[in-house]
Amino acid sequence: TTTTSTTTTTEAPSLDVPGTLLSSEPVDIGDLGVAWRVTYLSTSVAGEPIEVTGTIAAPAGDAPGPRPVLSVAHGTTGMADECAPSLRFPGESSIAVVAPFLERGWVVVATDYEGMGGPGIHPYVVGESEARGVFDIVRAAQSMPGVGADGPLVVWGHSQGGHAAMHVAERWQDLAPDLDLVGVAAGAPPSQFALLSAFLQGSDYQGYLVMAAASMAATYDELDLEAVMNPAHLHLLDELEKGCTGHIFDVFNEIPY
């Protein structure tokens, strides 16, 4: 299937309905089907309407009826806009996930989460934000003519995505009772944060702790990161939005915890 690079912007979109499709840009995935990089409305951790980006892929041709949907919650890539997985789609790893489902007639959607490819800081491992992104891109896919994303929904995620998937299961009835969620698979979800913190301190992956701490401090007003961080290192927090996980590890792994 050949696609063009034209970006389609919807006319007069609602400014407060989660899942409203704001724009779509075709992405070429060859004979697997059709795909788009999309921008859609979700809700921020502050409860405000926010733009979020992601990917929607479907088998070629108009759906003969409702198709089952897989909503993928991605693992940790970083906190900067440049780390949004949709910017690298299609890649070898993403196609490996998408292809088997497209071949079986599924629609596959994948959010970039709040703050990655959209305004604001990425609320890393903030479950409600992750779950909203996962749900709302399904609603966006449902509004696309011919895609047929109205069938049963399964959510899968690994690592950070596993954390998102757990919150999808926990918050489904509150956030998306309109969606027919029939299954959730949470792979390697970070859950016991006290144990994880002790394990990660001084390791090659200490940067994860800084990402989580900065995210929580930006999300919850009662948390003051400056009160627990060495003043000599505060300026390094700006580096969180200057690169992806490799850059973050390089900057923060050598800092005494």
Go through each PLM region and give its residues:
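Catalytic-loop region of hydrolases
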Residues: T1-T2, T7-P64
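Short, surface-exposed "cap/lid" segments of acyl-processing enzymes
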Residues: S44-E103
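Short beta-to-alpha linker loops that shape the active-site pocket of alpha/beta-hydrolase fold enzymes
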Residues: T76, V107, D112-M116
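Alpha/beta-hydrolase active-site loop
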Residues: A96, Y124-P145
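Primarily recognizes the serine-hydrolase "nucleophile elbow" in alpha/beta-hydrolase
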Residues: R139-Y208
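Accessory cap/linker subdomain of secreted extracellular hydrolases
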Residues: G187-Y257
